[in-house]
């Protein structure tokens, strides 16, 4: 007999189907171990600042906040006037440097991370050079030199974060300092080590020279000195006049070549920030997409629907126009592609594939990308929808291997900083590898994202920069508050479901297993909004009933009882007391009829029409498919694989769980819609994925029990000449094709007949079955107890780090 979803959620594939699943007192206690008797004081006080937090986040959509870069501002300050080499072009930048030196003599970012001393050294030396060039700030130069001398050892400290190009640029600036006759009393050993390291890197790059090396050298042009071929550098000039959207590189190019477009770009950058510049400009698209990504990953995007829609529309417009801000940056391109495609925009994967081919060929990867970019590209490469996207699929396999290698080597390099950053990054990479986006339920993914969220907002290129759009405590706070609010409602709904089981006497059926918590969990973990209560309970109740009836067909009922049950559903308006063959049939049919009528009444209020007959028809399809399998087993009939799948995708029992819930998620569904081929195709694709996954993992058990199975039938239908391994590979390829087609239909809104919230339910269920089978041997009951606990019973508590950050925000 087929395993319906709720049965799958209970059993290890090797466990016997006839085994009854019961909770011992210990396991029942384990299931609710996370339910705290008293809510923490921090969580209890959260609602008072919920709206304030939401308001602050909303402001991020209207104003991009990006930190000023002292390093880049110093290089812009070195730019001479177009009319006189003896005068600065941007005297206000010089004044900014004079006014923003720190008390210790450095030019560090406020509250900079202690592992950023190399960045501080580089920024401080650049500021000194700018002031010395124009003969101003003698006292500031003196204090800056003193800071460099005291902290020079950090330049070769392997424990410190090394900014991009530091080993080339910093020694070059020391050479410039000597040219300015600056008297730096530096430790000779450290100085010689720096120069030796620079020479080695230059020799290695010359030995392995490639287009990627040329790009890297162009990016760090200010550190190349006389070695730089400026004509080759200008190949990388963008439409806005910049080189790599980087003020320091562009300033160095203007100093060398007097290119007017470079100068125009610098004026634009200063217009944006006043008397200083950022490390990257422009960065608007990436910043806004980071905000959207944070909100979606943490489960709070519903509070910012209008703002997010505006960002998506603008990003799509820029994508279609070929905006360089998207297509010349790997992270931005990958994030834009993933966000747009997942939100139903028609975007080609070609730009992502091209960037992947460029970024990860040769040594360029180590110079211009880090683990965050690799992870972003990996997530984008998962979204293969079309048969002609084989290149993207191949790159996905490469990226997965690369991430696994970096994890195993322990050499994770990040452009992010923060407390326990390595632990957080490793957790994020592990989650991405272990649970592909299609194999994790939405609420489970969001809980994991909240738990491993790194709200440090620092990034590092040649220098560090930060933005609250990249991450902040407000995102984290709002997501925790929202998760716990929903979870409290979910616990009440689970209690209602458990009462329903007792009221309908389903607990009296000795052959049936207790699984209401798991059936409800699959709903709460996929569509969790409070207003979808009726849809969740419909999903869960029908999940309970499908497993009860599956058990009845498999071990609990005689042939006469099974036929009687089907006849009762067909006749519907019958006298239960006289027409039921047995007590068990009476309980099952009574519960089924009462539940279908209840769902029909609720749906009538939303739909404005009676849909009860449709729900009855859905149930009859399932019952007849189960009876057909029973008859096949009785008659020892061996169907073809096509005959089997035509019936088995229905007997997998997802129809009564998913299809009635479509009427309760909000949009109106006309009779034409539910009769449309799209509706039936979505159901078949979803159910086929589930059936094949089940049959692969249940092969050994069902073979031993002499039961029909897609895998065994595939081997039989090929004359026994196909090995089990080859058959499994073929089945997995089939699953992949079906899953991608399902996702394409769910995402392609313009061509769709069904409303998006309805299409998404099919994808949610597909994720449920993929999550269960994502582990080699399936989920054990203990795995599921832990998952149910985290989604329904265990609130997320603010840790000390988050609490401290929030205290500063809300004081």
Swiss-Prot record:
Q: Name one Pfam family in it.
A: Terpene_synth
- Which parts of the sequence bind Mg(2+) 2? 550, 554
Where Mg(2+) 3 is bound, by residue? 694, 702
Family matches, as InterPro entries = Isoprenoid_synthase_dom_sf, Terpene_cyclase_plant_C1, Terpene_synth_N, Terpene_synth_N_sf, Terpene_synthase-like, Terpene_synthase_metal-bd, Terpenoid_cyclase/PrenylTrfase
Transit peptide interval: 1-49
What metabolic or biological pathway is this protein involved in? Secondary metabolite biosynthesis; terpenoid biosynthesis
Record motif DDXXD motif, residues: 550-554
Sites where the protein binds Mg(2+) 1: 550, 554
Q: What does this protein do?
A: Involved in diterpenoid biosynthesis. Catalyzes the conversion of ent-8alpha-hydroxylabd-13-en-15-yl diphosphate to ent-13-epi-manoyl oxide.
Protein name, as recorded: Ent-13-epi-manoyl oxide synthase KSL2, chloroplastic
